[in-house]
């Protein structure tokens, strides 16, 4: 009988430790802010077609290619300017003086453009739109 009680106590103790461990793991997960009224600033992500629509309908925007200069020189979207993702840091970007300007951001595949968009938002830019990579671009490419 003592063995059964001892086993039950050990089982309860062990299960308490395990559930306590899991709750501390759950609490260590990063928080995701789902509040749409939050003051957290972010960028918009759109499809390639939506980007083309903006380019056809709007006139006051900048197309920002964040690839390396050698990639840019091999071919880019017409009228795009090149500011490599690696060059976007905590300093002002002379090519982008107006922080409220609509800026359409792309790279080769979409990874660097997302990263650059996040950096631009942190620098105070308020109208950043990321649309992926030139590998999906169906329009004209100039070099």
Task: Locate the predicted segments by residue.
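Rhodanese-like catalytic fold shared by cysteine-dependent sulfurtransferases
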Residues: 2-7, 12, 17-54, 61, ...
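Short, polar loop motifs at secondary-structure junctions
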Residues: 66-71
């Amino acid at each position: 009988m003592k063995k059964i009680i001892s086993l039950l106590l050990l089982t309860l103790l062990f299960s308490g430790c395990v559930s306590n461990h899991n709750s501390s793991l759950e609490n260590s997960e990063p928080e995701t802010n789902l509040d749409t009224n939050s003051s957290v600033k972010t960028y918009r992500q759109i499809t390639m077609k939506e980007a083309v629509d903006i380019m056809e309908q709007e006139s006051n925007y900048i197309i920002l290619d964040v690839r390396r200069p050698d990639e840019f020189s091999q071919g880019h979207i017409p009228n795009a300017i090149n500011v490599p993702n690696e060059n976007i840091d905590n300093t002002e970007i002379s090519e982008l003086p107006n922080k409220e300007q609509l800026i359409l951001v792309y790279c080769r595949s979409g990874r660097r453009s997302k990263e650059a968009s996040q950096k631009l938002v942190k620098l105070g830019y308020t109208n950043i739109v990321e649309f992926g990579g030139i590998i999906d671009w169906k329009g004209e490419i100039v070099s």
